[in-house]
Amino acid sequence: MESKQLLQKLLAGEHCSKEEMQDCMNSIMDGEFSDSVIAALLALLQKKGVVANELAGAHASLMAHATTVALSTHAVDTCGTGGDHGGTYNISTTASLIACSAGVRVAKHGNRSVTSSCGSADVLEALGFTLELPPEATISLFKKTGFAFLFAPLYHPSMKRVAHIRRELGIRTLFNMLGPLLNPAQVKRQLVGVFSEELSELYADVLLQTGARHALIVHASTEEGVILDEPSLNGTTFVTEIEKGVVRKHTLRPEEFGIAPAPLAALQGGDKEHNARIIQSIADGSASAAQRDAALYSSAMACYVGGKCACLNDGFIVAKEALESGKTQAKLKEIIAYNQALVTEYHVAKS
């Protein structure tokens, strides 16, 4: 479909088919559309509202343009859409480290911050992790430690085509929604945080289309009136679960896991150095109860989708044991140490 036809279709408020959106994204990534056309398409899609077939079509195109890496069919990603304005520290990154120390194989896909002061890549860098490992080194890290961090710019180089357009637009677009779907390891087990019920429905549809084996899509309310893209310590957490093609919905409360309610302010983050200190304090046992419990709540979910336990309550027990026994602190040190050994071995230039 020509760009003019696409624009007319979106102006009329009509949805694109999966195939139309895949072709559209191919044209964008291959440099066939001008900047002005791309900006118009993104703005019109956002105004109309993106539907599942459009998201699935864009996903298919971007994965075809990506550098993929084979890690494990059991690997888990913990990733959120961002945009919830909760201002929390890097809970999903912390959860991935705790889950890894509990025996879950983690393939975390992430980037530097877009909507917060500190993204997953930022905080890992502050912990001493070098982001720019080549794929073969990342495979070695995963085999050795059970953890991989897949730095988005290395695996999705075609996204540079739209980076300046997204910056100039300054609004959320289709690309903000795609992040959790674009793991280069093509994981089939995920904990996905979203910031609305509508997005939960959308992601469930797309994850079914893309063959998810076990996924939890999470958003939560708070007493402060903020919607989070992670479990809440003082409100209701809404979970859409996908397992082997079946969709189930749950609601959770912190007290079900023995978690004491805590205000959102107790989970506030800051810059990458501040958030790295929080992660280190959780690992060494000196963090506040609220900081620890928020990480364990998400870790329980990662352990569950990773197949380490039969239910979320057992996942909480498994994650808590790993943290309190010192396994998480040891795992964090192991990951950073081997990452740095690989930097030397592969002559990686640090940014």
Swiss-Prot record:
Subunit structure and binding partners: Homodimer.
Biological process according to GO: L-tryptophan biosynthetic process
Free-text comment on the cofactor: Binds 2 magnesium ions per monomer.
Known cofactor(s): Mg(2+)
Top EC group: transferase
Annotated Mg(2+) 1 binding sites: 92, 230
Function: Catalyzes the transfer of the phosphoribosyl group of 5-phosphorylribose-1-pyrophosphate (PRPP) to anthranilate to yield N-(5'-phosphoribosyl)-anthranilate (PRA).
Keyword Amino-acid biosynthesis carried by entry: yes
InterPro entries for the chain: Anthranilate_Pribosyl_Tfrase, Glycosyl_Trfase_fam3, Glycosyl_Trfase_fam3_N_dom, Glycosyl_Trfase_fam3_N_dom_sf, Nuc_phospho_transferase
Chain sites annotated for binding 5-phospho-alpha-D-ribose 1-diphosphate: 80, 83-84, 88, 90-93, 108-116, 120
Family classification: Belongs to the anthranilate phosphoribosyltransferase family.
Name the record gives this protein: Anthranilate phosphoribosyltransferase
Enzyme Commission code: 2.4.2.18
UniProt keywords, alphabetically: Amino-acid biosynthesis, Aromatic amino acid biosynthesis, Glycosyltransferase, Magnesium, Metal-binding, Transferase, Tryptophan biosynthesis
Pathway: Amino-acid biosynthesis; L-tryptophan biosynthesis; L-tryptophan from chorismate: step 2/5
Binding site residues for anthranilate 2: 166
Enzymatic reactions: N-(5-phospho-beta-D-ribosyl)anthranilate + diphosphate = 5-phospho-alpha-D-ribose 1-diphosphate + anthranilate
GO terms assigned for molecular function: anthranilate phosphoribosyltransferase activity; magnesium ion binding
